[in-house]
């Protein structure tokens, strides 16, 4: 904790307010001694968090939330893409998930052809996409390593073991195309749930906890807003009447994407 003249003055005022003796009755040396004892009484949990620690916790939570959203959105898009052509265009579905993920421009710049295989690869394991699931988990682990003392053992174990398992699944999918995609997406969702559960069940309700919550909620709001925007401006063809069969299937998929579908 950095001690400045302003902080010393504030502590002195607080001490004066909590005592029946006026501070003016003490000499400067005695006042300084009172300030020192007051500072020593401050608990470690009351000290200000370093900005870099707060930043790492915030982005750790955002990356974990983003990976979970991408896994659920990919799962929903795969369902929509399997609908009969009479219900819509599969290419539109894959373009919509790129827009929902905020990755449409990066995908176009990569020179990839817009199809199912390329979109899935770009959003899962592409190293040239900083917003892919692989990149999100790697960056989440990097931030977690920087603030391990602010995390509980359960949270770190979830992130670290999840990262190692993701690397194994990546090798398996590279050898076997996208046959294991369903298993991989389910694994990412379970990893995210374990992380959230660890944060909720094991973290002290201090600054570290609230910075992780802020990161998660901001990322969730951002993803949900983009998803709704895409639903209204991209997915539904003009000829389709709102409330029709395609509209129903799309809303059902969106509920799955945001974990809001009831059983």
Question: What residues fall within each predicted segment?
Answer:
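Alpha-helical transmembrane segments and their helix-helix packing motifs
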Residues: 1-263
